[in-house]
Amino acid sequence: MIKIVDYGVGNIQAFLNLLKRIGIHAERARTPDDLDTASRLILPGVGHFDHAMEKLNESGMRDTLDRKVLRDGIPVMGVCVGMQMLATSSEEGVIPGLNWIPGKVRAFKSIDGFTLPMPHMGWNQLHPERTSQLFRKGFEKSTQFYFLHSYY
């Protein structure tokens, strides 16, 4: 069962509607018990990193999420600030992230003195530098992915 983590920050109904439209059943998870039957997770989020982490920590779901993802190995997809929360920390705040992906989330600024337009928006190809569980099945070199983000 796909569970969309509802910790008070995010566009939960948009995800439920999208998945329903493509024929996939998903449910909202508001409590740790709601996560018991999760076989996949979506962690949405809108807004500031610290606010989102604060709300998740207050929700009481943090320990259950850690167990489901780290011990049980269920797949999780973070969207917007939900994806940023998977990291150790963010330069946008001081509250620690989930630390499921080691690293610090940073805002795009410039590369070699060239200021980058923000947000980074549009269709681009990916060129993975190393083998990743995310891309274990691979994809064709011509595959395009849509990006809309200001952080990496």
Give each language-model segment a name:
Residues 47-121:
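Cysteine-nucleophile active-site neighborhood
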